Curated annotation (Swiss-Prot):
PROSITE patterns: CYTOCHROME_P450. This is Cytochrome P450 52A13. Induction: By N-alkanes. Its cofactor is heme.
Length: 519
């Protein structure tokens, strides 16, 4: 025995041998532990996307290519068809990522197993622009943000649709100036929603719809406001790229990105300070003149950083989601004259048209009574959800209820740190729930009472469900109603192939714009 010890003694003193042995032991112990966990939870293997090889480099190149072409979501649909499963695993540079469109798995990630998943590196992705807000935080920080912001989206605040009218009139002037010629209405909608969102949030609009041909309204520091809108757009594009890079987000941190973030922060801090400088009496007086998000938040916190971050988080959500929804709506209405005419008839009957439009009757309550308008909005959010793909990361060893085994009905194992990507876009187009015409724009499908559950989640679900969903729906419905009252002809001027190329960053919109004429 002593001879044996003497013979191995030199190796025991070599640190790399000891460390190697420990690593092998740890690896084996981990494998045994995972196997026991899988057996305990009846987990089965899920399919893998078999075309991945060479460290996923061909796939990564293809993903970058189709994203540039605006075909990322359609490419993902083809992958589902190739794999023939609702849930599968794909390895990106050797790291497994679970991809799912199964409503039961989405329910688990977002609701029933909510505490097993977090945002992962999202905070790091978005922090340079959005800081610590409701969309970037997990845990107690998120809970505090949500409790602070929830009262700001009460029915009383959502119902103030008349505040949209001055901005809508400015939009209408741009359309009339085109005199029936082709316009990119998506560009106008993005300007409209940043104007309405900044007035709602800051108490002062950036008036991005202001134009040399349109003389109103006179504003101070218009150049500063214009640069804010442009900087916010640019910074947001960078954020989208950082999000898709996941753990390699830090690659996107150039001087242009940092400059845009600074301009946005400087602008926002100016209005935050204006709110903080007001006395309680002045804030109350301002509130009597109309609801302003910032002034209500100032009553809850005096921390300028908290105010800035929450305002920018809400601006991100409130501006792009509504603009995208409106753009896709007018795109599909222009493609489907029958639907356009039927919607017009309902609006005319409810609220009049042209010079006889009864604008004061268009309220939160009356819009909800417009059944066909509701069907159109539901169908648009089904086909074009604002956030088509989202991610969560497992905070501990856990499972998803389905996706394993030959039939896909067994639970699957999810290791700690594993990313789960769920595609609302794909779920909303499943024939199992929406029939063989699931890819078609058909508002009438909502005439039937459907128990869709987690197969229809345009505003996410569970504890993190969108606080502003009624606000967005009301704003979009009001704008559609008013534009159809003003313009009774809508034509699409776009000969590009269908489906349209879609830009997918943080939210989704038409990659190349929506070109129509209104008269």
């Amino acid at each position: 025995m002593s001879e044996l010890l003497d013979s191995i003694q030199p190796y025991l003193t070599k640190w790399y041998v000891v460390i190697s042995a420990l690593l092998v032991s740890f690896f084996i112990a981990h494998k045994i532990s995972v196997a026991r966990f899988k057996a305990t939870h009846n987990c089965a293997a899920s399919p893998e996307y078999y075309k991945v090889n060479w460290f996923s480099l061909p796939l990564l190149y293809r993903l970058i290519q189709v994203k540039r072409e605006g075909r990322l979501l359609d490419f993902a649909q083809k992958i589902y068809d190739d794999v023939k499963a609702l849930t599968f695993v794909i390895k990106i540079v050797g790291v497994p990522v679970i991809i799912t469109r199964d409503p039961e798995n989405m329910k688990a990630v977002l609701a029933t197993q909510f505490n097993d998943f977090a945002l992962g590196t999202r905070h790091a992705h978005f922090k340079p622009l959005l800081g610590d807000g409701i969309f970037t935080l997990d845990g107690n920080g998120w809970k505090q943000s949500r409790s602070m912001l929830r009262p700001q989206f009460s029915r009383e605040q959502v119902a103030h649709v008349q505040a949209l009218e001055p901005h809508l009139q400015r939009l209408a002037k741009h359309i009339r100036l085109a005199d029936g010629e082709t316009i990119n209405i998506q560009d106008l909608f993005f300007k409209l929603t940043v104007d309405t969102a900044t007035e709602f949030l800051f108490g002062q609009s950036v008036y991005s719809l202001k134009d040399a041909a349109i003389n109103d309204p006179p504003t101070e520091d218009f150049d500063g406001r214009s640069s804010f809108a442009n900087s916010f757009n640019t910074a947001q594009t960078y954020l989208g790229t950082r999000a898709y890079l996941q753990m390699f987000y830090f690659i996107v941190n150039n001087s242009d990105f940092r400059k845009c973030c600074k301009q946005v922060h400087d602008f926002t801090r100016f209005y935050v300070q204006k709110g903080l400088d007001m006395t309680p009496e002045e804030l109350e007086k301002k509130s009597e003149n109309g609801y302003v998000f910032l002034y209500e938040l100032v009553k809850q916190t005096r921390d300028p950083k908290v105010l800035q971050d929450q305002l920018l988080n809400i601006l991100l959500a409130g501006r792009d989601t509504t603009a995208g929804l409106l753009s896709f709506t007018f795109f599909e209405l222009a493609r489907h004259p029958r639907v356009f005419n039927k919607l017009k008839e309902e609006i005319y009957e409810a609220f009049g048209k042209g010079d006889d439009a009864r604008v004061s009757e268009i309220t939160f309550e009356s819009l909800k009574k417009c059944e066909y308008l509701k069907w159109v909005m539901n169908e648009m959010l089904r086909l074009y959800p604002s956030v088509p793909v989202n991610f969560r990361v497992a905070t501990k060893r856990t499972t998803l209820p389905r996706g394993g085994g030959p039939d896909g009905n067994s639970p699957i194992y999810v290791g700690k740190g594993t990313t789960v990507a769920y595609s609302v876009y794909s779920t909303h187009r499943m024939e199992e729930y929406y029939g063989k015409d699931a890819d078609e724009f058909k508002p009438e499908r909502w005439a039937e009472s459907r128990k869709l559950g987690w197969a229809y989640v345009p505003f996410n679900g569970g504890p993190r469900i969108c606080l502003g969903q009624q606000f967005a729906l009301t704003e979009a419905s009001y704008i559609v109603t008013r534009l159809l009252q003003m313009f009774d002809k809508l034509e699409l001027h776009d000969d590009r192939p269908y489906p349209p190329a879609k830009s997918v960053h943080l939210t989704m919109c038409h990659q190349d714009g929506v070109y129509v004429s209104l008269s």
